[in-house]
Amino acid sequence: MRVIASILLGIFWTITTLAQDQQARLDTLRAEGYEALYNLDYGTARNRFQKMVELAPDNPAGPQCMASSLWLQQLNQSWQLKSTLYSTGAYTEGKAQVDRKQADEFRKWVRRAKQLAQARLRKDPHDVEALYFLGASEGVEASWAAGVERKFMAAFRAGTDSVDHHREVLKLAPNFHDAELTIGLMNYIVGSLPLPTKMLVATMGVRGSRKRGLEMLERVATEGKWARDVARVLLVDLYKREKRFEDAAQMARDLAAKYPRNYLFKLQVADALTSQIVALRKAKKPVIAAEKEVQDIFASLSHDKTLDTPTRELVNVRWNIARKELQ
């Protein structure tokens, strides 16, 4: 009897150890992939995410990361982002030039992530990780529909589903702060709507608050795990919308320091500082330090030989815009 118990204990220990090893490898690949992604190295990012898919084909994490990388790359390469960076204008102006092959690839990975998450939830409706990835996949689906395809009703439906699933996550695991990202963003968006539109969506059971939305995103930015930097990227622009220019600049500085190969974060610092300088001048406050920082950023980027020609042209465009605003 003791022999059987020892064998069973050994099998259990082996299975547990293997599962822990696999999760550790998945976490490492995910971290490496996101570091590459935020440094605009899409090839390396997708290489790591593909390895996640191969290592754990039944786990929705890999497909969801693949979909996220395609979404961010599409936004970075779109003409809206080239003119407004990560601003909310990228979600409200003209139509993006969508790469059909990339769009099909995006849908494939979103579909796969949702299917895998739903399969796990059929076995265990309280599987927190599966609920999170289902909501995260719906969240990136909403972002693609709004930011890339301009299909706002589709975005609203997917976004609402994402929020519902992430609320379920927080009921089961209150400290799962990554799940607050979609909820916080939806709160801010709905809270920012004109009153008639806000009243309309309220009839659908959707309500929001800018203040509450910002608080949730700030919590993700400080206490989240995988969604921490996504929250920071969002907060840069939301702070600018709130005219909190110094907060926006500092958040962008932190991102630029962490991801030095991402020139967009450096341009975000300059953009926030330019707006801050305009406001300070109106208040007749000193602006010398901020002006110097803006000049240093553009000087550094203009001499950066790692940037390609289109990026250099973008830097020149942003510099000309900044100079006009600061005259």
Where in this protein do the model-derived segments appear?
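Alpha-solenoid helical repeat scaffolds
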Residues: V201, A231-R241, A270-V278, S300, ...
